[in-house]
Amino acid sequence: MSDFILELLSEEIPSRMQKQASEYLLREFRQQTEGAGLEVGQIQSFYSTRRLTLIATNMKSQTAKMTVEKLGPRIDSPDDAINGFLRSNNIKSIDDCDILDDKKGKRYRYIETVPAKMAITILPPIIEEIIRKFSWPKSMRWGNGNSRWVRPLRNIMAIIYENNSVNKLKINVEGLLANDYTFGHRFLKNQKIYIKGVSDYFEALTNHLVIADQGQRRELILEQISKIEKKFDISVIKDEKLLEEVSGLVEWPVALCAEFDEKFLNLPDEVLQTSMRSHQKYFSVAEKKTKNLTNKFILISNIQTSDEGNSVILGNQRVLSARLYDAKYFWDRDIDQPLID
């Protein structure tokens, strides 16, 4: 048995497209391998802002040897029909066929022996076809060819791990050749990582500041938010859709608590939350007892800084302040303008 790892590393994938793309990759791989007669145990897919990963474990190293029955025309059929059957099935001579006597009468039959094929030769054309025909809501051409991807594709890692040995697949998509390595966090640890197996994949990426499992990133964000809630005695307003979105925007999530000027609390909650959630992807914060909004908010950063996030906090506070000044201007103007003159 062997394991297979495929990672497609690209520029940032929009968060809203990641889950659908991951499911498509898994579904296509399963259908293609089943069609090729390659037995695979468990297939899982993972996604992040830059990666689509597929892992197949307990995969057979080769397909089973098979025999395929091909039924031809009746023995009294015209020569053109018989010769057409031979040509379409690459049969050298009618002598290679036997005669089957069934309800339709006597007809020619050819028994083809299909030899076993190695997984390392079956998978490359499958992966190339999946990549070339990948279904994206929106896509762009990249490189010098005609292939399309949601953002430029930068690296393909495709390896089979068997008997403590790593074998790289020979894949070529518009000149982009498959490798046996990936890369760490784009800004924090952008180094080559040679992968030695499934367990090593996740561990090696974590050591290079990438959480490849979307579920693990989600749980990590929740844990960090919970610690902030206890530290500041606040209650972060639950937002599952926002949580799902920000989990797809980062590879190394760092939750930080920031704040805005209290004077903006005079704005309606809906205005504040729209400015924070829709525009900036921030979590709103309420007081534990009163449930009223506070001037604090939670942001999820994709980098870990040496100043404990202070520079990131200040930058985000400036951006939100500008948003809230705009919101206050339009709100005040609407208040001054009566509905009926």
Each language-model region and where it sits:
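Long, basic N-terminal domains or extensions that often function
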Residues: 1-292, 302-304, 319
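Function-dense linear segments that define catalytic or interfacial modules
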Residues: 284-341
